Curated annotation (Swiss-Prot):
It catalyses: 2-deoxy-D-ribose 5-phosphate = D-glyceraldehyde 3-phosphate + acetaldehyde. The lineage of its organism: Bacteria, Pseudomonadati, Pseudomonadota, Gammaproteobacteria, Enterobacterales. One of its GO terms (molecular function) is deoxyribose-phosphate aldolase activity. The gene is deoC. This is Deoxyribose-phosphate aldolase. The keyword Cytoplasm applies. NCBIfam families: deoC. Catalyzes a reversible aldol reaction between acetaldehyde and D-glyceraldehyde 3-phosphate to generate 2-deoxy-D-ribose 5-phosphate. It comes from Proteus mirabilis (strain HI4320).
Length: 259
């Protein structure tokens, strides 16, 4: 097995296979569930809008993969600074049955100098998720923050407020995951000494096995060789799956979007 096939197999098992499009339908979400059960094993999770969770739960159960986790998004994709709305959306997502909630950090408020609202929103959503036994991932939108100091600050605030994962991007802005932002975020996890509790998720723009391998190598370098697993590392992606399967000898499979 080459290093690339090993990385491809690992990356597949760490994927949050995603469809977050305005034209999503029951049919598209059902297809996504089928894709998550791949010939090389299951993805870690699927990531879909909250209203599709009951359907996805049923499809995953019927196809014999109830262990595939269901993630969803809240305060998405805008990252507004209204705590009541962010919390209400998170509670609704949990009521639908989400295993994991990816909430967007109020990054524009942080850029304007308000650190407190980010902490408050993450903490409120974390408390709700903890009660429901769900994981909370916090999307800091690195491609909009841009400034390394702000990327670090958003990561630190999210972790202090209880984030289970910090995630780069919504996939809805021009610049999504980059190795540079990944390095900054992983370094914060390392420097705060929270590697046991906090994971990392690059999202958007990771489209090939080669790119995935670069992120895995970066995580190994910063966090150590045994850190990467589904509790500590995810890829938020859709088009990546087809490339991983092609790398593993299954031919090119098209996915539902370019995320």
């Amino acid at each position: 097995m080459t290093d690339l096939t090993a990385a491809a197999r690992l990356a597949l098992s760490l994927m949050d296979l995603t469809t977050l499009n305005d034209d999503d339908t029951d049919e598209k979400v059902t297809k996504l569930c089928h894709q998550a059960k791949s010939p090389e094993g299951n993805t870690a999770a699927i990531c879909i809008y909250p209203r599709f969770i009951p359907l996805a739960r049923k499809v995953l159960r019927e196809q014999g993969t109830p262990e595939i986790r269901i993630a969803t998004v809240t305060n998405f994709p805008h990252g507004n600074d209204d705590l009541d709305i962010a919390l209400a959306e998170t509670n609704a997502a949990l009521a639908y049955g989400a295993d994991e909630v990816d909430v967007v950090f109020p990054y524009r408020a942080l850029m304007a100098g308000n650190e407190q609202i980010g902490f408050d929103i993450v903490k409120a959503c974390k408390d709700a998720c903890a009660k429901a036994g769900a994981l909370l991932k916090v999307i800091i939108e690195t491609g909009e923050l841009k400034d390394p100091a702000l990327i670090r600050k958003a990561s630190e605030i999210s972790i202090k407020a209880g984030a289970d994962f910090i995630k780069t991007s919504t996939g809805k802005v021009p610049v999504n995951a980059t190795l540079e932002s990944a390095e900054l975020m992983l370094q914060v996890i390392h420097d705060m000494g929270v590697g046991k509790e906090v994971g990392f998720k690059p999202a958007g723009g990771v489209r090939t096995a080669e790119e995935a391998a670069q992120y895995l190598a970066l995580a190994n370098r910063i966090m150590g060789d045994n850190w990467v697993d589904a509790r500590h590392f995810r890829f938020g992606a859709s088009s990546l799956l087809g490339n991983l399967l092609a790398t593993l000898g299954h031919g090119e499979q098209k996915s539902s979007s370019g995320y």
